[in-house]
Amino acid sequence: MNFIENESAQKLRGGYYTPLDLAVYIVRWTLDNNPKNLLEPSCGDGIFIQALSEMELPIGLSFTGFEILAEEAAKARDRCKNEPRLNSSIHTRDFLEWAINQMVDGNSKFDAVVGNPPFIRYQYLPEESQQKAETIFKMLNLPFTMHTNAWVPFVLASISLLKPGGRLGMIIPSEIVHVMHAQSLRTYLGTVCSRFLIIDPEDIWFDGTLQGALILLAEKKNSPIDHSDGLGIVKVVGRDFLSGNPADLFNNTARINGKTVVGKWTKALLTKSERELIDSLYEHTDVHRFDQIA
């Protein structure tokens, strides 16, 4: 176990910036829905703004970005100045604090959210930030754990601020698939999203870290009572997938829902026949949980 005084400044601020080709891929998918306004909750030096500048943009697209570090926010503003097609505003402030106010008032809703939220252990966050993270969970009536990570409340708040039918595209830690502290997020995605896709790479995308990361693409339900098609997971090797249309992966990947997405998502990596075999073993009269016999 590492102590906070032994961690690097980069790790303590969770700043692992997105490669441009991945940002372009995510932006391409969110723009496919013809958004009028777009949110980035942790814009860093503005790499997603750069990605937007390489795309054909909807007329009058509004971009709202947040970055807590003034030096990085200034870089993002410089990128905005070079993209006159965007009606952009970059705020140097805490996104979670702003998001809590918006969730209370219900004033701001977005057609799309993109980004790469900070990867920071809860224990390394300032006390004020810890309280804001816990508040996000409480506002969404989700169980909270102090084992969480900053990226989890960032994603929760971002989905909450999406309009019905809105899209979210983010790079997040691969631990979303299995860790207990992401269970509330997995549950929330399964409840409020009509479809969501994990693009899970074999490679490490960020230099200088062993942290695995993946792409999450999610589409919010138009109505809370709508059916959810659930989760799809695509394993990729290398970056060849980036030359394809993200909409093809999102629309054509086989999905699972129901009890399979209630817990850990590792079952989604199995074939349908493998899942059916495991389910039949669970229900077999001669198979028992360990806590039932010990």
Language-model-derived ranges and their functions:
Residues 1-7:
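N-terminal, positively charged/glycine-rich alpha-helical extensions of SAM-dependent methyltransferases
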Residues 11-12, 16-25, 42-52, 57-61, ...:
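Signature of N6-adenine DNA methyltransferases within the class I
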Residues 28-33:
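Glycine-rich helix-loop-beta junction characteristic of Rossmann-like nucleotide cofactor-binding loops
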Residues 35-42:
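Conserved class I S-adenosyl-L-methionine
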Residues 76-87:
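Short, conserved SAM-binding/catalytic segment
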Residues 85-95:
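Conserved SAM-binding strand-loop segment of SAM-dependent methyltransferases
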